[in-house]
């Protein structure tokens, strides 16, 4: 139910844009609209309903626009959950606590059955981060069968970028899902073993 999912995402303060269905690894995560405007503001629910009607069978889900329009949202994208675990284990205590209590979305499946991880962090107003990719000093004995990218990579995404939101079907055949999130996370967006955090309302 895309309108309900969109309404929930908007209620959590995210600016969203519609994405085309993922047909294969070369034609994935593609916006269905010109999205410059939504780097400055979030759409209204009526705009979203129009997208759902207009794109119908082509709609694969929504992307989350990072940075200021989503409440100063920083997303850390780990290509493999072992890279996420390494980062957490080596992060300073306050950073580790922040990340462990932030919303966590699982992404595509890798060759070893493990998944990528997106961590959503809201920064204080006035703070910003440069978009960048970082190769972490960890060996991961797996691969993405569809793409030739290192799985020890961390993608840092803020203003001017977007990430695929929960509910989207990845080309590996699984849906992006929320592993840790607000207690009112819709059932269709929850990963198996979902953990709801009552205090996450304060994060929004």
Where are these regions (language model features)?
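Conserved phosphate/metal-binding and DNA-contacting active-site motifs used
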Residues: 1-204
């Amino acid at each position: 139910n895309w309108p309900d999912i969109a309404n929930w995402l908007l209620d959590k303060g995210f600016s969203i844009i519609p994405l085309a269905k993922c047909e294969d690894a070369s034609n994935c995560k593609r916006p269905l609209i010109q999205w410059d405007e939504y780097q400055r503001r979030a759409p209204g629910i009526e705009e979203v309903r129009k997208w759902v009607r207009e794109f119908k069978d082509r709609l694969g889900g929504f992307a989350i626009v990072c940075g200021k329009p989503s409440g100063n949202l920083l997303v850390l994208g780990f290509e493999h959950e072992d890279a996420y675990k390494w980062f957490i284990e080596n992060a300073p205590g306050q950073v580790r606590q922040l990340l462990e209590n932030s919303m966590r979305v699982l992404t595509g499946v890798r060759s070893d059955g493990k998944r990528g991880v997106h961590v959503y962090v809201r920064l204080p107003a006035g703070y910003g981060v440069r978009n960048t990719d970082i190769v972490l000093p960890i060996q991961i004995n797996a691969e993405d069968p569809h793409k030739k990218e290192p799985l020890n990579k961390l993608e840092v995404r803020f203003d001017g970028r977007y990430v695929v939101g929960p509910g989207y079907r990845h080309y590996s055949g699984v849906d992006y899902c929320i592993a840790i999130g607000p207690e009112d996370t819709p059932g269709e967006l929850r990963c198996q073993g979902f953990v709801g955090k009552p205090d996450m309302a304060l994060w929004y």
